[in-house]
């Protein structure tokens, strides 16, 4: 569908409201045209619940990576929680079941140069990050399920 693009930009974020968490992502072309969004509310799991919005951001990054792999082939994951990239690159150690699962899922895509990472400061008006933040919040408020799996 978007294979003609050299890459896409995927902004990801997570949110937590009253102990429930969710994630969202927004896909942009290299010239910043919004082409796809998705979001989903998280499952009720003690470890994931304790990780709060980080669980949503991990989930959004994994879903965005699947979208990138299927629809374009290369993308940059823009994130405001630095651990998303530090775990995958090995700069930070994982010590929880779900962060290890996240790394096991993401590292092959990173190693094959399908994805790369770019940190952005949250809540500073970066459009893609604000859209992803809104999507993550809406996933909880409206009990949304991921469209693309």
Question: What does each of the following model-derived ranges do?
Answer:
Residues 133, 137-149:
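Charged phosphate-binding loop/patch that engages nucleotide di/tri-phosphates or the phosphate backbone
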């Amino acid at each position: 569908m978007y294979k003609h693009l050299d890459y896409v930009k995927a902004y990801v974020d997570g949110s937590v409201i009253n102990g429930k968490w969710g994630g969202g992502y927004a896909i942009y072309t290299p010239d910043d045209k919004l082409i796809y969004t998705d979001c989903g509310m998280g499952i009720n799991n003690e470890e994931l619940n304790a990780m709060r919005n980080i669980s949503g951001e991990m989930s959004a990054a994994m879903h965005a990576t699947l979208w990138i792999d299927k629809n374009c082939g290369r993308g940059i994951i823009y994130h405001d929680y630095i651990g998303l990239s530090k775990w995958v690159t090995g700069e930070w150690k994982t010590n929880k079941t779900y962060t290890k699962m996240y790394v096991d899922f993401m590292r092959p895509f990173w190693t094959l140069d399908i994805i790369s990472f770019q940190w952005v400061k949250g809540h500073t008006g970066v459009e893609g990050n604000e859209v992803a933040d809104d999507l993550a919040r809406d996933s909880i408020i409206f009990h949304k399920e991921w469209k693309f799996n």
